[in-house]
Amino acid sequence: MRTVPLFAACLLLTLMAQAEPLPRAADHSDTKMKGDREDHVAVISFWEEESTSLQDAGAGAGRRCICTTRTCRFPYRRLGTCLFQNRVYTFCC
């Protein structure tokens, strides 16, 4: 008796997982396009002591580093540049 609802729930879950997402409304994409370019930030954490090239660049073990489109904010300082998805970002540690 319990197997039928359980089977139906599994079937529904499977169909929902395979279904294509609904297209976004046009007004959502227009407001996104009207706004200024978003600031993309990629957070990178270095925890290995073996990465000597990163330590020479100032990114010591356990230090949190980010790649951002803006200038580095306190307590971070600029150590170079990052390349992510064919865009150049500021590398801050």
From Swiss-Prot:
Disulfide bonds: C65-C93, C67-C82, C72-C92
Chain positions listed as propeptide in the UniProt record: 20-62
Classification via Pfam families: Defensin_1, Defensin_propep
GO BP terms in the entry: antibacterial humoral response; antimicrobial humoral immune response mediated by antimicrobial peptide; cellular response to lipopolysaccharide; defense response to fungus; defense response to Gram-negative bacterium; defense response to Gram-positive bacterium; defense response to virus; disruption of plasma membrane integrity in another organism
Compartmental location: Secreted
Cellular-component GO terms for this entry: extracellular matrix; extracellular space
Domain of life per record: Eukaryota
Function: Has antibiotic, anti-fungi and antiviral activity.
PANTHER family reported for this sequence: ALPHA-DEFENSIN 1 (PTHR11876:SF28)
Family: Belongs to the alpha-defensin family.
Protein name per its UniProtKB record: Neutrophil cationic peptide 2
